A protein has these predicted regions:
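Polytopic alpha-helical membrane-helix bundles and their juxtamembrane interface segments
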Residues: 1-119
C-alpha cells in the first residue's frame, strides 16, 4: 500500500471519525477530550507550517490545516463545554469533507480516472 493510500485511510477513518464524533457529541464530550483537541490543534498547526515550508508546491493543503482545521480544534479545545454549537457543526462538516475528499482519491488510486490522475 502506498504512502498516499495510508494518508487517505488515516483521514477517512481516524480524522473523519473523530471530527464526526466530536461534531455530533458536542458539549457531551468526555472532559478529557477538550485538552486533547487543543493539543491536537497545536500539533497540526506546527506540523503543517513545517510542511508548507519544505513542500511549497502543495502549500494549499497545508494552508487549509493552518487556517481552518487547527484554529477550529484549538477553539473547541480551549472553550470546552462553553463552545457554541456552530463550531461543532463546522467540525462535523470538516469530518464529512475529509471522508469525501480522501475517499474520492483513495477510490481513484484503485480505479484511476482523468480527475485523479491530474492530482
Amino acid at each position: 500500500m502506498s504512502k498516499e493510500s495510508l494518508v487517505q485511510l488515516f483521514h477517512i477513518i481516524l480524522v473523519g471519525g473523530l471530527f464526526i464524533y466530536v461534531g455530533i457529541t458536542r458539549n457531551d464530550l468526555p472532559k478529557f477530550m477538550y485538552p486533547t483537541l487543543l493539543v491536537l490543534g497545536i500539533i497540526i498547526f506546527l506540523y503543517h507550517i513545517y510542511k508548507s515550508i519544505i513542500k511549497p508546491q502543495r502549500a494549499w493543503i497545508n494552508y487549509i490545516h493552518i487556517f481552518l482545521i487547527s484554529p477550529l480544534l484549538v477553539y473547541i479545545g480551549y472553550n470546552g463545554q462553553d463552545t457554541p454549537r456552530k463550531f461543532f457543526e463546522l467540525l462535523l462538516m470538516a469530518g464529512f469533507a475529509a471522508i469525501g475528499y480522501h475517499g474520492f482519491y483513495l477510490v481513484g488510486s484503485i480505479y484511476p480516472t482523468k480527475i485523479t490522475e491530474d492530482k
